[in-house]
Amino acid sequence: MPLILGGLAGAAAGYGAAAWLERRKPPPGKDPNIKHASLGVVRLDWHYHPLPGDVGSPDSFEYPVYYRAVPGLTFEICQSGKMSPEIQQNFKDAIEFLDKERGVSVITSDCGFFMWFQKEARLYTSKPVVMSSLALLPSLHAAIGTDGKIAIFSANSTSLGPMHDTVAKECGVDWDEACYVLVGCQDVEGFEAVASGEPLDLEKVTPGIVRKAKQVIAEHPDIHAILMECTQLPPFSDDVRAATGLPVYDAIVSADFFIRGFVDNPRFGLNDWHRPWDGHQEKYKLGDNVQDKEKLLHYKP
């Protein structure tokens, strides 16, 4: 009995790749208005000026992104890992808004400390939830193994410490193991603006971040990859890649990875999501999509 091959194997075995791909094309005019895969971002109740590359900037993504602020959830409260019942309800409302009202494919956040609420966020939606790039650690560890190390860059390594047990439980990763190196950027000139909500000066901060990366690698030459935990670090990822030659993973890479699960291969996709996106983003500013009474309570002009 002859062996019957399907998929790409079948194409290579005798059907002819070109003909196979032609048959895989969706019918003309199938649905020109089909919705592109999109990202939902749960935002802190604070105002800062995101750089291109930051999760808070829609220009960081090549697909639609929608934002929803959580009234009352300040940076300090998020960092503590404890929400009041009122803020918890607002958190739930934000996720359900992104899921049901905007129909996003994946939900993430604009602060790495949202990892405190990874488990809770999953209760409110069936969509993939990745509150922090730390969720990538298990895959990175599996890919690199125990012979290499992963450097985890954060805004402040000291304030990240209390989240150790939550990360261990949610990600199955113990960053106290020798294969992880925690790196705080709190001493990088200009990066203190993150804590105060002030705009980051890209030209001022970039040399310090790159210098920090080189220093850490010099001290730990067996580092094989870098993970940016803070959502305001991705604007510097390209410079760190260029300076170190190492792969750098961050919140943008994390979002891209999970979005790709909803996007067909552009060579032979079936659902038209591979059609070019027109680049339109929903306009967003702090205070959008919240009730007037919440604006009065939590948003200052």
Swiss-Prot record:
Q: Which GO terms describe its molecular function?
A: dimethylpropiothetin dethiomethylase activity; racemase and epimerase activity, acting on amino acids and derivatives
**Induction: what does the entry report?**
Expressed at low level.
Judging by the UniProt lineage, the source's domain of life is Eukaryota
Where are the active-site residues found? C111, C230
Keyword terms, alphabetized? Lyase
List its EC numbers. Answer: 4.4.1.3
Subunit and partners: Homotetramer.
Comment field (misc): At least 10 million metric tons of volatile dimethyl sulfide (DMS) are released into the atmosphere annually by the dimethylsulfoniopropionate lyase in oceans. It is a component of the tangy aroma of the seaside and functions as a chemical attractant that guides various marine animals, such as sea birds, invertebrates, and some mammals, toward potential food supplies. DMS oxidation products act as condensation nuclei, causing water molecules to coalesce, with possible effects on local climate through enhanced cloud formation.
- Function per UniProt: Mediates cleavage of dimethylsulfoniopropionate (DMSP) into dimethyl sulfide (DMS) and acrylate. DMS is the principal form by which sulfur is transported from oceans to the atmosphere and is a key component of the ocean sulfur cycle.
Q: Which family does it belong to?
A: Belongs to the aspartate/glutamate racemases family. ALMA1 subfamily.
Query: Which protein, by its recorded name, is this?
Result: Dimethylsulfoniopropionate lyase
Q: What species is this protein from?
A: Durusdinium sp. clade D (Symbiodinium sp. clade D)
